[in-house]
């Protein structure tokens, strides 16, 4: 990560121009060895992360914006992540924050979400948990034995602690590779039936991956997957608008399905 370039880019921002979102790369460290990681070569260089003071300068110059997207590496390895989130809540009045995680630290995640809900009560927090398939499929893809059950433990503990909290959202994120391509539909169906997740996003492996040969997908294959999982996303849409009434119900459902299709096209098909 080029710290000087990142910092200078934010210094150049005009605080008079309101941003919608900021993507913040908080660490290059990771406790997994994902086969499809497109940042592996950069992580191997072990470049230093942005310091808290550097991130503070970003917050102080960004002005108000709505959504903070945390990125890495594995964000839960950043010890001061709670302070970083609270910084942007106080200075920038964020309304939503998204945190991706491999779920290897379930207790830390739950502890941090509790702290965030207490100190940032008006902000939604979305925990985006990586799950790529059943059991050993997930562990093989992530390069960590037992990762699957750790991730499930994380998801279960989030449900137990925040099940009725509408400001704590749970999203499952799956990356399509040669390891899981034959179980995407079954896996998504299983996740939908077992957990009260907000949604389940999928994307194809992209970039210079750690392991050669994980990106075996063609446009026709991705189109077929899109068609196969369409009923699952319809079920997610129905779940989302279950308590919605009037004209808002079909409109919300329509835009949700359109957004999901657009995300799939951008995150997967554009990389073929």
Residue ranges and their predicted role:
Residues 2-125, 161, 220-228, 232:
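Conserved alpha-helical substructure of the radical SAM core
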Residues 119-269:
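Radical SAM enzyme [4Fe-4S]-AdoMet core and its adjacent flexible, acidic
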């Amino acid at each position: 990560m080029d710290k000087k370039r990142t910092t200078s880019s934010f210094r150049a921002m005009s605080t008079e121009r309101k941003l919608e979102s900021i993507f913040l790369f908080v660490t290059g460290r990771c406790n997994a060895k994902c086969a499809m990681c497109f940042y592996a070569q950069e992580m191997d260089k072990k470049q230093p992360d942005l310091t808290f003071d550097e991130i503070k300068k970003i917050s102080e110059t960004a002005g108000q914006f709505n959504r903070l997207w945390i990125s890495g590496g594995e964000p839960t390895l950043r010890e001061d992540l709670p302070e970083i989130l609270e910084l942007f809540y106080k200075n920038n009045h964020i309304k939503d924050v998204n945190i991706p995680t491999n779920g290897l630290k379930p207790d830390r995640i739950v502890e941090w979400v509790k702290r965030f809900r207490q100190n940032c009560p008006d902000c939604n927090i979305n925990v985006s948990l990586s799950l790529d398939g059943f059991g050993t499929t997930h562990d093989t893809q992530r390069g960590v034995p037992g990762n699957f059950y750790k991730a499930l433990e994380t998801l279960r503990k989030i449900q137990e602690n925040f099940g009725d909290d509408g400001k704590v959202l749970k999203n499952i994120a799956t990356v399509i590779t040669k390891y899981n391509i034959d179980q995407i539909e079954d896996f998504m169906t299983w996740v939908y039936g077992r957990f009260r997740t907000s949604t389940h996003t999928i994307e194809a492996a992209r970039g210079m991956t750690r392991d050669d040969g994980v990106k075996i997908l063609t446009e026709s294959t991705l189109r077929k997957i899109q068609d196969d999982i369409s009923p699952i996303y319809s079920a997610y849409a129905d779940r989302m608008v279950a308590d919605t009434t009037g004209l808002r119900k079909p409109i919300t459902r329509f835009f949700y399905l359109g957004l999901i299709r657009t995300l799939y096209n951008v995150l997967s098909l554009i990389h073929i």
